[in-house]
Amino acid sequence: MEKTREGEIRRETKETDVFVKIDLDGSGKCSANTGIGFLDHMIQQLSSHGLFDIEVRANGDTHIDDHHTNEDVGIAIGQALSKALGDRVGIKRFGHFLAPLDEALIQVVVDCSGRPHLSFSLDIPSQKVGTYDTELVKEFFGAVVSNGGLTLHIRQLAGNNTHHIIEATFKSFARALRMATEIDPRRSSQIPSSKGVLEQAGQ
């Protein structure tokens, strides 16, 4: 029986209550209800372009601001991703993608190494897109990286529209992550490291 690559996390704090479920071998089905409309839209991009089935439910103190919910959703997504990857046997491990959206062009490179690191180089011109604080984009990816055990490099090669820059980033991340988490048929029973082990973050 083939092992399913799914991760499910329930995270409760005094500030938020977050549930995340991820199936790495899905078809792009998504149900996102975080209370933050723009974040829901970006999670839908992650699901659609990564072909991950993602369910996210969150209740948080958004009457104060979106910071806690945004970060805790990122934490839970990272933890669910790490759980779905397990010991990371057979994955391609590395992924990269260049995604355009009109004038914006974003490059993302990811390594499912178990070693969290974020290099984030976006020049986002506006402080808000709708009601969403754009500084929270970096906070979201930082939370995913730290709890998912990813090395992630994000580079903006072009772009001057805030929405386009952020959406292209999520699309590029989705495609790169899809590539990195796919099973490599040439090493389906091996861990993709000369050390013979990759760390499991977020456990």
Curated annotation (Swiss-Prot):
Subcellular location: Cytoplasm
Keywords: Amino-acid biosynthesis, Cytoplasm, Histidine biosynthesis, Lyase
Top EC group: lyase
Annotated GO CC locations: cytoplasm
GO annotation (BP), single: L-histidine biosynthetic process
Family the UniProt entry places it in: Belongs to the imidazoleglycerol-phosphate dehydratase family.
EC number per UniProt: 4.2.1.19
GO molecular function ontology, one term from the record: imidazoleglycerol-phosphate dehydratase activity
Species of provenance: Prochlorococcus marinus (strain NATL2A)
First-listed, main subcellular location of the protein, grouped into a coarse class: cytoplasm
Name of the gene: hisB
Reactions this protein catalyses: D-erythro-1-(imidazol-4-yl)glycerol 3-phosphate = 3-(imidazol-4-yl)-2-oxopropyl phosphate + H2O
Pfam families (alphabetical): IGPD
Pathway(s) where this gene product acts: Amino-acid biosynthesis; L-histidine biosynthesis; L-histidine from 5-phospho-alpha-D-ribose 1-diphosphate: step 6/9
Name listed for the protein in its UniProt record: Imidazoleglycerol-phosphate dehydratase
Region (Disordered): 184-203
Taxonomic lineage: Bacteria, Bacillati, Cyanobacteriota, Cyanophyceae, Synechococcales
PROSITE patterns per UniProt: IGP_DEHYDRATASE_1 (PS00954), IGP_DEHYDRATASE_2 (PS00955)
